[in-house]
UniProtKB/Swiss-Prot annotation:
Pfam families: eIF-1a
Quaternary structure, from the entry: Component of the 30S ribosomal translation pre-initiation complex which assembles on the 30S ribosome in the order IF-2 and IF-3, IF-1 and N-formylmethionyl-tRNA(fMet); mRNA recruitment can occur at any time during PIC assembly.
Name of the molecule in the record: Translation initiation factor IF-1
GO cellular component, one term: cytosol
GO MF annotation, one: ribosome binding
Organism: Bartonella tribocorum (strain CIP 105476 / IBS 506)
UniProt keyword Zinc present: no
Amino acid sequence: MSKEEVLEFSGVVTELLPNAMFRVKLENDHEIIAHTAGRMRKNRIRVLAGDKIMVEMTPYDLTKGRITYRYK
């Protein structure tokens, strides 16, 4: 997938789910399910409930996303 097709949104983690999945509430009040990106997993960046994050989504499935950044 090329970078032009990716949609980026900010949101807040509301719930931790099994298998390293997270329920995220986006700034536009949509709720999605997201997983951490491979680079975040590799660098052991922890994501907890209440963290403000950046999520990448594909325009084809707007219910799932990938967490790419955790704000400090």
